[in-house]
Each structure stands twice: as structure tokens, then as C-alpha cells.
């Protein structure tokens, strides 16, 4: 006889879905943690050397496709089946990684358009993947185990992310497969590896049966699209989406802007020297040689975000299992704001890691709860649809945040541009030029490309790379770029507090 008081267990399909998610995230973060460097870092020899504004535009369109397409694909996953949707998405994701690897070499196509086109193919695949796997997962969970279930899912996501943070060092620094370190060939191998990891999910999809969504299987595509649009027009749902959009605008800058900020400004030399006890092979994977001396790469520093979540998110989910989801999210928002400011206001790698800890604690409380909240308030037969809405705040936030970050960082934060600005404003050579104050015209005005900016500044000033970096830090204070993002996060927290108070009066939104 079944004990009616027994807690529902997490079954085999639940764990298979989590493994599929882990491989997808490992492949994704193998690319994502290095994409900011590949796109615009002036001192990386194998990168594309695009501008911060170009990067912002690419990230904005990436976010639009990856996060807004699930508005449609969530309903399609409910209609046509989660497993079929995931299979289509995996093939598209593999194609996206291969396009990133090889389209750079297509004659007559600029680096900007080749990367943008390839990344949109990848984004399309991801947009089909998310509603499929999250819809399948939601049907494996009940109200009694949803907090722990979503916490485990978030834990698995970060296992993939954590491993994905270290793989680039093997391909880029150690130069696997005979490619010189940080060369175009090494970057290509990195992207091919992501395609290979993604292909493993094709095998895993054969190991379980599809989960019935509960939605109509005879409904036409037009009706699915109409239902998708009419459901999202609910004013209270739109208010929640707007609040979370502001929060994700702030959050994503740790992953999208912080890599460039670390590469430009953070001094991880003391941390690198403290790792001298590591075996030579491992040390070579977590320490890179830079003009400023041995440093810990930004992808390794930011891996602490995934590491902290791996060791803490399941416990955090257990601690908050009886907490109202909106209340837990509010606390998490406040912690993330503090962490962002601590991580962004320093040149010390040790203090940055402390900020990442605060940021990660906030993410542990907010990230899983956003999915749990929408799954709990979703009407029957609409879990895939509502979980497709999870991505909308990310899309809006990353779209606006990418545009803002590109504009702000190009003018106030990028070291190569600030080096050119210093040459224009404070050196005899620069004072003979007629610069109009527009950062975009600095290269043409001075006749110095961004890739040579720091070398020329050192030549004019007589300073070494460390001293030249400090000169720019104290002259232009690039850490102020984090203030607008923190301010937007504070607005989101205040709005969520008000929404949470009002939701107590709505039985269908109070979760």
C-alpha cells in the first residue's frame, strides 16, 4: 500500500533531463565565457577585434532571438511534444557552433556579419531547447518537490557552466591539437568542441519516453501563436516580466561585461603567484602570461560563480523550500546588487571573488525561484508556454543591457580606448591632432589602431604595462561603469517588493 504522506521522488527521466541540460550548458559556456574576449578584446591575437559597440549590438540580437523566440517555441513544445522539440534544437545548436567555427573564413564576409549570423543560428537552437527541457522537467515535479527539483536543475546547469569555464584554457592557452595559443586556429578548435559536446544529447534523447504536456495535439500552429500572445497580455504577468527584465539587465553584466573588465583592469598577479604549488600542467591551464605578468584568466575567476552555486544552490533551495517564492527572489536581488558593486569596484582578484560570492548567493535565491514561480502559477496544459515566458525578461534585460554596456564601456571603460584618449588629451603627439571628443573617431584621428594603443601609450609615457594601467585607472576611474547597472537593480528590487505585497491579494499569482 502506498503511503499518502510519502514525499514524491525524483524519477529516472528527471535525472536524464538534467544530464541533457548539463551537456548543453557545458557546450554553451565553453563559448559564452570567452565570447566577450573573442569579439572585442584588443590584445587577444586570434580574436575578431570588433568594438564594444559592435559587441553590444551582437549581444542584443543574440538575446532577442534566444529569449523572445521561446514565446512561440514554448507553445509549440506543448503542441508538438517536448522530445521532438529538443531533437530539432540540438541539431540547430550543433550547426550554430560549426558556423561560428568556420564562417570567419568565408570570403567577402566581414568578421562582424559572419559572427552575428552564426550566433543567431545558435540562438535559434537554444530558443527551441529551453521550453522543451523545462516543460519536460516541470511535468516531473509536484508542488511538494518543485523547490528542490528546480534547485537540482539549477545545480546541474552550473556543473556544466563550471566545467565550461575551464575548457577554454585547455584549447586557448595550452594550444591543444597543435594550434598556437590564442590563435585563430585555437579559437576554431574551441567552437568545434562545443559542437561535439552538444552532439552527445542526441544519444541521450533516445533513452526516455516523451512526457505528455496536457495540451491539445490537434491545435493548429496559428492557434498556438494566438494563444501564446493572448496569455502574455495579462497585466500582472507583464508587470512581473518588466521587473525581472530590470534585474536580468544588471545580472548578465557579470557574464557579458565583466570578462572584458577583468582582462583590462583586474590584477590577479598575487593570486597567480599563490598558485605556484600546482603541478605544471594544471598551472599552465589556470595561469596565462600577459604584458602585465602572469595572471589568472577571467574565465577562471568567473568560474567561482558556478562553483559557489554548485556547492550551495541545493542547500539554498532546501532552506527556501517553504519560503514564498517572491520573498526569496527579493532577498536574492538585494544580495546580487551588493555583489555586483563589490566585484566591479576593485582591481584586486581576491576582492572580486568576494563580490562574486555575494552575487552568487543572490543568484541562488532568484534564479531557480523565477522558474518555480512561473511553473506554479501556470494554468493546466500551459507549463511549457509559461516557462517559455521565463526567457522574456532575460531577452529584454540583455538586449537593453548589451546596448547600454556597449555604449558605456566604449566611452568610459575599455582600456584600449582610454589609452587612445590619454594620448589625445595628455601627450604632445595627441595635442597636435584635432580630436572631436567622439571615442569612435579616436583611431582615425590619432592614426593608432586599438590593438596598438597600450604599446603606444607606454612608448609616450615611458611606463611599463602595470604602471600604464594604473595611470589610466586613476585618471578615468573606469569602475564607475557599474553604477547605472546597480541603480537599475535597485529599481527592480523596489518594484518586486511592491509586486509581492499586491500579489497577496491575488490567489492565482501568490506563490
Question: Which residues does each PLM region occupy?
Answer:
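Short amphipathic helix-loop junctions that connect adjacent transmembrane helices
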Residues: 33-54, 256-297
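Central cavity-lining transmembrane alpha-helices of secondary-active solute carriers
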Residues: 56-75, 162, 303-316, 396
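Intracellular juxtamembrane helix-capping segments at the cytosolic ends
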Residues: 128-142, 364-379
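Glycine-rich segments within core transmembrane alpha-helices of 12-TM secondary carriers
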Residues: 147-176, 194-198, 390-405, 409
Amino acid at each position: 500500500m502506498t503511503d499518502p504522506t510519502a514525499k514524491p521522488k525524483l524519477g529516472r527521466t528527471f535525472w536524464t533531463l538534467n544530464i541533457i541540460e548539463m551537456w548543453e550548458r557545458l557546450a554553451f559556456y565553453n563559448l559564452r565565457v570567452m565570447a566577450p574576449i573573442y569579439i572585442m578584446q584588443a590584445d587577444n591575437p586570434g580574436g575578431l577585434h570588433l568594438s564594444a559597440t559592435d559587441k553590444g549590438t551582437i549581444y542584443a540580437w543574440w538575446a532577442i532571438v534566444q529569449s523572445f523566440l521561446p514565446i512561440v517555441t514554448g507553445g509549440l513544445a506543448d503542441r508538438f511534444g517536448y522530445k521532438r522539440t529538443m531533437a530539432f534544437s540540438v541539431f540547430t545548436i550543433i550547426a550554430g557552433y560549426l558556423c561560428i567555427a568556420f564562417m570567419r573564413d568565408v570570403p567577402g564576409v566581414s568578421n562582424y556579419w559572419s559572427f552575428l549570423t552564426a550566433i543567431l543560428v545558435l540562438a535559434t537552437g537554444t530558443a527551441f531547447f529551453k521550453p522543451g527541457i523545462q516543460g519536460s522537467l516541470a511535468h516531473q515535479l509536484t508542488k511538494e518537490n518543485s523547490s528542490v527539483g528546480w534547485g537540482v536543475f539549477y545545480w546541474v546547469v552550473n556543473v556544466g557552466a563550471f566545467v565550461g569555464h575551464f575548457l577554454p584554457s585547455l584549447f586557448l592557452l595550452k594550444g591543444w591539437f597543435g594550434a598556437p595559443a590564442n590563435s585563430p586556429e585555437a579559437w576554431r578548435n574551441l567552437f568545434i568542441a562545443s559542437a561535439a559536446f552538444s552532439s552527445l544529447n542526441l544519444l541521450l534523447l533516445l533513452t526516455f519516453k516523451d512526457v505528455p504536456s496536457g495540451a491539445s495535439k490537434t491545435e493548429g500552429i496559428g492557434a498556438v501563436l494566438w494563444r501564446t500572445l493572448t496569455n502574455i497580455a495579462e497585466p500582472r504577468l507583464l508587470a512581473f516580466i518588466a521587473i525581472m527584465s530590470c534585474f536580468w539587465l544588471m545580472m548578465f553584466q557579470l557574464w557579458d561585461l565583466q570578462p572584458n573588465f577583468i582582462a583590462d583592469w583586474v590584477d590577479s598577479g598575487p593570486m597567480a603567484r599563490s598558485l605556484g604549488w600546482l603541478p605544471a600542467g594544471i598551472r599552465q591551464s589556470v595561469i596565462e602570461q600577459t604584458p602585465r605578468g602572469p595572471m589568472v584568466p577571467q574565465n577562471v575567476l568567473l568560474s567561482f560563480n558556478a562553483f559557489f552555486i554548485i556547492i550551495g544552490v541545493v542547500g539554498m533551495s532546501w532552506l527556501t523550500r517553504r519560503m514564498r517564492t517572491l520573498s526569496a527572489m527579493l532577498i536574492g536581488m538585494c544580495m546580487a546588487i551588493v555583489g555586483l558593486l563589490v566585484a566591479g569596484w576593485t582591481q584586486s582578484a581576491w576582492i572580486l571573488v568576494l563580490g562574486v560570492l555575494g552575487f552568487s548567493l543572490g543568484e541562488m535565491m532568484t534564479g531557480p525561484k523565477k522558474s518555480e514561480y512561473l511553473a506554479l502559477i501556470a494554468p493546466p496544459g500551459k507549463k511549457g508556454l509559461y516557462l517559455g515566458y521565463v526567457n522574456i525578461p532575460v531577452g529584454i534585460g540583455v538586449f537593453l543591457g548589451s546596448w547600454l554596456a556597449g555604449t558605456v564601456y566604449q566611452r568610459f571603460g575599455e582600456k584600449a580606448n582610454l589609452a587612445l584618449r590619454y594620448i589625445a588629451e595628455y601627450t604632445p603627439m595627441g595635442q597636435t591632432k584635432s580630436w572631436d571628443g567622439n571615442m569612435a573617431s579616436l583611431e582615425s584621428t590619432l592614426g593608432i589602431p586599438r590593438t596598438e594603443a597600450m604599446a603606444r601609450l607606454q612608448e609616450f609615457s615611458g611606463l611599463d604595462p602595470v604602471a600604464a594601467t594604473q595611470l589610466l585607472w586613476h585618471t578615468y576611474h573606469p569602475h564607475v561603469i557599474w553604477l547605472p547597472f546597480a541603480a537599475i537593480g535597485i529599481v527592480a528590487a523596489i518594484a518586486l517588493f511592491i509586486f509581492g505585497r499586491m500579489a497577496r491579494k491575488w490567489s492565482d499569482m501568490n506563490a
